[in-house]
Amino acid sequence: MHRIRTIDSDFGKKRQKKMDNHISSMIYEIKFHEFVLFILEKKMGATRRTFLTDLARKKGFRVENELSNSVTHIVAENNSGSDVLAWLKTHKMEKTTQFELLDISWLIECMKVGKPVDTKGKYQLMESRVDSANPDPTAGTLNILPPTTKTISQYACQRRTTINNHNQRFTDAFEILAKNYEFKENDDTCLTFMRAISVLKCLPFEVVSLKDTEGLPWIGDEVKGIMEEIIEDGESLEVQAVLNDERYQSFKLFTSVFGVGLKTADKWYRMGFRTLNKIRSDKTLKLTKMQKAGLCYYEDLIDCVSKAEADAVSLLVQDAVWTFLPDALVTITGGFRRGKEFGHDVDFLITSPGAEKEQEDQLLQKVTNLWKKQGLLLYCDLIESTFEDLKLPSRKIDALDHFQKCFLILKLYHHKEDKRKWEMPTGSNESEAKSWKAIRVDLVVCPYDRYAFALLGWSGSRQFERDLRRYATHEKKMMLDNHALYDKTKKIFLKAKSEEEIFAHLGLEYIQPSERNA
């Protein structure tokens, strides 16, 4: 492998030049010769650029301090394709150069996995190439072509949405407003903001002006007004008013309790409750078994579940299920399947290619009984299956499925290597130390021939699934839910052994779970 000594460059700032000189004195080993990077300082800042440059070089990338003819990839942060294009047009080049323009998320992902990842698709800001009418590499001109602008679909199932959200300042604000309208049971306005959130999350750039939203679906006047306020003032008065609203605060607190929905939250609010301590201390209040468990383990349950904790729960679930059905498929679904690092619970889909119906029906009861004997079961609500083989998919977009399922709270013990996080306070007894955490777990059992449909439905996101069903209905005259896909024109059920086959039936390009974070 070759080694490279970086070249000094004057960026016009003494401090930056000093930092670059420090970097230039280091020697790094180049592992990936087909990549020559230039990191754009625009909107990033000199300090962060220097840090990322040094980090990329340590990982084996060749990074140029100046834009030169040898550069193959330009990496930018918080810039749209038009921003980078404008910057490039003002930059003088000695000869025609061919390169790709990439978002900084590409470089960060490369450094995570320790090697270059595919540059196509979600990481591209724009495409550039030599003008075919002027192929002479010595012609002395740079021909930059704007990106291929594809119309962003109104359907989330036709958009690729990773966990890399470039517009979080807007989506965070809209999530607050959407939640407030949900609390008011104003479903239409809630959906307005949820759709706007979904569109903004799929964008590979940060919206810096309302011009960037031209042509985008579901970005109406109400949404634009709030975005304009955030762009100009850094915040929205409407959002701040919601955050300060007593009803919103109370509903948000009450619905954070496992087992509490909008009706219960409204009842408690009307009864004058504002804190959970008041609810706990009121002996006249009748609570369900689920609500009692939610209050009992509240502190644990509102604490996010990490990917490491989800993996530990996966082992627990697999061991228990395989005790009774050795050939069972146990698949983690929900946000963790979509690549999220944190969640509020852990969902699993279970099926078995060789199990009899009686074995499937008895599985969850056997598994929960085992955990009860092991002292791991803190709460269990088992819902029996009402699934019917020939029943048409539901017409309701948000309909729940009819598979057997159980909603659990499990006791997850922490490993010894994690004991520093859970060590006892000075002077406490060992018996007082809490060595476990209460975790919310959902288990769903489905017949093997419905596994693909159930997996697609339980993987989410909610908006992705809503739009997938809406697309099937309005564009394909089909009905889709967690159980089946039905063609209303041909009057037949369409079978599928995989998610890919379901997408194919719908005439859609397959979208990986990691790109369904709509």
UniProtKB/Swiss-Prot annotation:
Its EC number is 2.7.7.31. Gene3D superfamilies: 5' to 3' exonuclease, C-terminal subdomain (1.10.150.20), Beta Polymerase, domain 2 (3.30.460.10), BRCT domain (3.40.50.10190), DNA polymerase beta, N-terminal domain-like (1.10.150.110), DNA polymerase, thumb domain (3.30.210.10). A motif (Nuclear localization signal) lies at residues 11-17. Residues 27-124 form the BRCT domain. Keywords: Magnesium, Metal-binding, Nucleotidyltransferase, Nucleus, Terminal addition, Transferase. One of its GO terms (molecular function) is metal ion binding. It holds the Pfam family BRCT. Mg(2+) binds at D345, D347, D442. Its cofactor is Mg(2+). It catalyses: DNA(n) + a 2'-deoxyribonucleoside 5'-triphosphate = DNA(n+1) + diphosphate. One of its GO terms (biological process) is DNA metabolic process. InterPro entries: BRCT_dom, BRCT_dom_sf, DNA-dir_DNA_pol_X, DNA_pol-X_BS, DNA_pol_b-like_N, DNA_pol_B_palm_palm, DNA_pol_lambd_fingers_domain, DNA_pol_lamdba_lyase_dom_sf. Its main location: nucleus. Signal peptide: none annotated. Can also utilize other divalent cations, such as Mn(2+) and Co(2+) (in vitro). Residues 260-264 are annotated as: Involved in DNA binding. A 2'-deoxyribonucleoside 5'-triphosphate binds at G335, F336, R337, R338, G339, K340, H344, D345, V346, D347, G457, W458. The keyword Magnesium applies. It is found in: Nucleus. One of its GO terms (cellular component) is nucleus. Residues 153-518 are annotated as: Mediates interaction with DNTTIP2. Template-independent DNA polymerase which catalyzes the random addition of deoxynucleoside 5'-triphosphate to the 3'-end of a DNA initiator. One of the in vivo functions of this enzyme is the addition of nucleotides at the junction (N region) of rearranged Ig heavy chain and T-cell receptor gene segments during the maturation of B- and T-cells. Belongs to the DNA polymerase type-X family. Interacts with PRP19 and DNTTIP1. Interacts with TRERF1. Forms a ternary complex with DNTTIP2 and core histone. Released from this complex by PCNA. This is DNA nucleotidylexotransferase. It comes from Monodelphis domestica (Gray short-tailed opossum).
